[in-house]
Amino acid sequence: MTLSPYLKEVAKRRTFAIISHPDAGKTTITEKVLLFGQAIQTAGTVKGRGSNQHAKSDWMEMEKQRGISITTSVMQFPYHDCLVNLLDTPGHEDFSEDTYRTLTAVDCCLMVIDAAKGVEDRTRKLMEVTRLRDTPILTFMNKLDRDIRDPMELLDEVENELKIGCAPITWPIGCGKLFKGVYHLYKDETYLYQSGKGHTIQEVRIVKGLNNPDLDAAVGEDLAQQLRDELELVKGASNEFDKELFLAGEITPVFFGTALGNFGVDHMLNGLVEWAPAPMPRQTDTRTVEASEDKFTGFVFKIQANMDPKHRDRVAFMRVVSGKYEKGMKLRQVRTAKDVVISDALTFMAGDRSHVEEAYPGDILGLHNHGTIQIGDTFTQGEMMKFTGIPNFAPELFRRIRLKDPLKQKQLLKGLVQLSEEGAVQVFRPISNNDLIVGAVGVLQFDVVVARLKSEYNVEAVYESVNVATARWVECADAKKFEEFKRKNESQLALDGGDNLAYIATSMVNLRLAQERYPDVQFHQTREH
């Protein structure tokens, strides 16, 4: 059976995001991936903060100052005969809910681990989010040009801490100053590393066969023997790669390399295009939508302001789930039941926008938004249904926000509500007083909000500390019991930006007591948009 042109386009799409702890090398890997996809000519190494050559995927002002990627940008590039969409996820010390939500829009994730450190805290958190949908995971052990931990130990740690089996695809030969290259377990080939070639695609020398005397000559007899001994162990102790188990999120293929030295990244990319799934079906509140359907559907997972400092526009990022987008198409925004003509959707190469004539499942479109689109919005060609699984996550950090000029209360509220619809921050208005409490998943979100309130709404605001530990969205099937709960806990209830009722707890103990005292009330950690 030959595939129709539409199905061919769908089959070649791969949409993935990178998850890692800050400084494990995510931005560097992103650059090298783009280099292989010929999307950029030379990789602008991230480190030189003073130089003008900023990494391609870092943009808003604050990012340029701090050398970190705050906004989740989207990059599309060709690789072999696939088209890859890479969604960048903010990775530095401070990230935000955007990072979590971006993971709901991809079909596969690449986990980058600093091989000197192993599994770190942020990696654990992000893996939990991918578990909500059993997303397939590839793993890249990075920084082999430094001294690393024992590779066997690293695999054990991933298996024990992240509860996913490891299937090594390549295996390192030495590390740090002695790093010589990697051996490919399934191709029986050794790829030799040369240092100092990080900015370009290297011509790699390949030695066929594990027992080839050329290998001893190339890496030295000691390392060659050590490799053979280690491989005996590896083959006995680790999982074989199995595509079914990979797609079910039960095992992860593991690649070793150095992103900075641009070595090993292509092995991982080859695995990605060969094994990662083409665009997957998704649930709505009424049925499952398959990527092969001809009617267009998509959902908004993120909204970003000011991608263009010259325009005060906001761009909504939409993941195409099924059907083909064509310029000038009429789509229904399900939440408002209005039909809109979309003639100026964008694709991205971080910061460089270009208008799209067409897009397919797995692609990400940017829609111009003047405050009418919200996170979680579904667009269809008329069918009334809503995609599920795009949550709000309960904030972990809270501040009270106060105006320097009390006459601007109205602008402040407007600004905060718009920023919360965009997912930049969450805002809570306590029922019993006039405070405004801002909740975030990461500290940097607070700085971003104050900066944006000033530049976009001309409001100067400051933060004060507030006695709030966590928030939970509350609901109850029994109206009478709910009224009683609301009456007795008025001082701890607040409305969020979308007017949903939330319980604001001063401590985890306080939350636990409330949950015990009111067993009929449900306290939710996430809320569907």
Swiss-Prot record:
Domain of life: Bacteria
Coiled-coil boundaries: none
Domain tr-type G: 11-280
Annotated compartments: Cytoplasm
InterPro entries in the record: EF-G-like_DII (IPR053905), EFG_III/V (IPR035647), G_TR_CS (IPR031157), P-loop_NTPase (IPR027417), PrfC (IPR004548), RF3_C (IPR032090), RF3_dom_3_sf (IPR038467), RF3_GTP-bd (IPR041732)
Entry-linked NCBIfam families: prfC, PRK00741.1, small_GTP
Function according to Swiss-Prot or TrEMBL: Increases the formation of ribosomal termination complexes and stimulates activities of RF-1 and RF-2. It binds guanine nucleotides and has strong preference for UGA stop codons. It may interact directly with the ribosome. The stimulation of RF-1 and RF-2 is significantly reduced by GTP and GDP, but not by GMP.
Stated name of the protein: Peptide chain release factor 3
Designated gene of the protein: prfC
